[in-house]
């Protein structure tokens, strides 16, 4: 696993808005990934959680998969033609075929699910603590736990994860 970078390494810079895209106001975004020319979004809220794709020109959302009403959707990751979505407190991850939306698998895991990303081989999951878990995508079994620290102190409440240039970024 790559080194995990604390806030002393955060890039602080100015920015400019290059484009504004419409977005459904009712979508409670929990996971976001741009892949294969489409913006994928995992949303939360009990009874309303979905995985959807968004048309950047119109903001139109196309529901790809709907979670059971009792599940609160969280982070998503696309890997090997599959979409993985965590749930917050249901201890479940869903795996869908990225072309058809068919549910392929359902995995159980301990604790909460918050953020999810991939390096193209493994999955990396946060659970709201200072830990990031390396997961086997075929079994969803934890292979490694990495505790993120900053100046010797644990950095709790890690949420959304992104894999960028060999590093995991978290908010």
Tell me what each language-model feature is.
Residues 18-50, 65-77:
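Beta-strand-rich domains and repeat architectures in extracellular enzymes and scaffolds
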């Amino acid at each position: 696993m790559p080194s995990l970078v604390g806030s002393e390494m955060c890039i602080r810079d100015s920015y400019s808005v290059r484009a504004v895209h419409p977005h459904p106001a009712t979508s409670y975004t929990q996971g976001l990934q741009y892949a294969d020319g489409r913006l994928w979004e995992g949303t939360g809220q009990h009874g309303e959680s979905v995985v959807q794709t968004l048309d950047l020109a119109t903001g139109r959302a196309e529901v790809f998969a709907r979670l059971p009403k009792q599940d609160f959707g969280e982070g998503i990751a696309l890997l090997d033609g599959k979409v993985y979505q965590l749930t917050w407190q249901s201890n479940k991850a869903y795996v869908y075929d990225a072309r058809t939306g068919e549910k392929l698998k359902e995995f159980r895991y301990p604790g909460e699910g918050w953020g999810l990303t991939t390096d193209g081989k493994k999955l990396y999951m946060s659970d709201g603590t200072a830990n990031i878990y390396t997961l086997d995508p075929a079994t969803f079994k934890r292979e490694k736990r990495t505790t993120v620290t900053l100046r010797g102190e644990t950095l709790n409440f890690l949420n959304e994860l992104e894999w960028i240039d060999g590093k995991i970024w978290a908010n």
